[in-house]
Amino acid sequence: MNLHEYQAKDLLESYGLKVQKGIVAHNPNEAAQAFDQLGGKFAVVKAQVHAGGRGKAGGVKVVKSSQEAREVAESLIGKNLVTFQTDAEGQPVNSVGVFEDVYPVTRELYLGAVVDRSSRKVTFMASTEGGVDIEEVAHNSPEKILKVEVDPLVGLQPFQAREVAFKLGLEGKQINDFVKTMLGAYKAFIECDFALFEINPLAVRENGEIVCVDGKINLDSNALYRHPKLLALRDKSQENAKELKASEHELNYVALKGNIGCMVNGAGLAMATMDIIQLYGGKPANFLDVGGGATKERVIEAFKLILDDENVKAVLINIFGGIVRCDMIAEAIIEAVKEVNVTVPVVVRLEGNNAEKGAKILADSGLKLIPADGLADAADKVVKSLG
């Protein structure tokens, strides 16, 4: 689950980090009032959306008066912002953040952390190349990114943060401020179950003060039951409507740009299914994992979700029966096909627990379903069904 910038900054500030002061505004008048309340000569109005690249897309503007703040807010709120990280429709802008002007600054740094699956540790990354896309830095100048793996038994130690500060070229009080920032960020990461966080840029002001000018936080969705206050910050308007609907039925769904709908149980099998569709010349329209303990109702909802995509011209159902019985899947498929007006070819491959029984149920249903014997046969048939 992603947080908006203003929410991320509020959370980081509660852990002792110095952040760029700001006020969220939901309409132009509130934006004008926020400018006056901040009391500076300048302010920065930023569209609050769950996407990067806002500046290049016109979602970040420097304003010099409350009237300018009102005008910029009016041009953003209620519109969709299209960036390199969004789809063609963009993300809806329901609010803007009006932030204090912290510039000029002497340096822009980068500080971030992720859960590194390979090392199974929280790994911090820091760089002198702040204010730019960190992926670009990693590609062009990987030597400019410092990495610190944190031992989960003892946590991030002050000496590790000091070492990073030295390598970033910080001096005097800046070192202590950076250590405080990094330690506070780690504490927030662990206590709030972050999956990812970034401060880009982490600015060094002319007076030596270190300030978080931006903030990006992604929370581990599997841990949200432990954080009801953070869950309350969820902005469903920023989420893909189909993916949101899928999550309500405990389905793992990701929309893609192909025309072959996929329903599979198990993430690994789902990825293998997408790969073999691609191998046979097809294009998957989605990733959809109904889970190892899929119920009849969940399968029906998954089928509806796939067919709700107008780009889907054929469907491949690939089920390996373990905990999930293939006969139950077969009954759910029949019920879903009867309930939804299916006008596209449906290829079904069942293997494992009660597979023969499931195949017989489908064969006796009288529905125009295409049985497949094996994964390769299923991929071949679904691609050929497109004509």
UniProtKB/Swiss-Prot annotation:
Source taxon at top rank: Bacteria
Query: Where do the annotations place substrate binding?
Result: 265, 322-324
Record keyword Nucleotide-binding present: yes
EC supergroup of this enzyme: ligase
Query: Quaternary structure per UniProt?
Result: Heterotetramer of two alpha and two beta subunits.
Q: Which GO terms describe its biological process?
A: succinyl-CoA metabolic process; tricarboxylic acid cycle
Indicate yes or no for the key word Ubl conjugation.
no
Q: In its UniProt entry, what is this protein called?
A: Succinate--CoA ligase [ADP-forming] subunit beta
Summarizing the function annotation, the protein's role is: Succinyl-CoA synthetase functions in the citric acid cycle (TCA), coupling the hydrolysis of succinyl-CoA to the synthesis of either ATP or GTP and thus represents the only step of substrate-level phosphorylation in the TCA. The beta subunit provides nucleotide specificity of the enzyme and binds the substrate succinate, while the binding sites for coenzyme A and phosphate are found in the alpha subunit.
Binding residues for Mg(2+), per the UniProt record?
200, 214
Describe the family membership recorded for this protein in Swiss-Prot or TrEMBL.
Belongs to the succinate/malate CoA ligase beta subunit family.
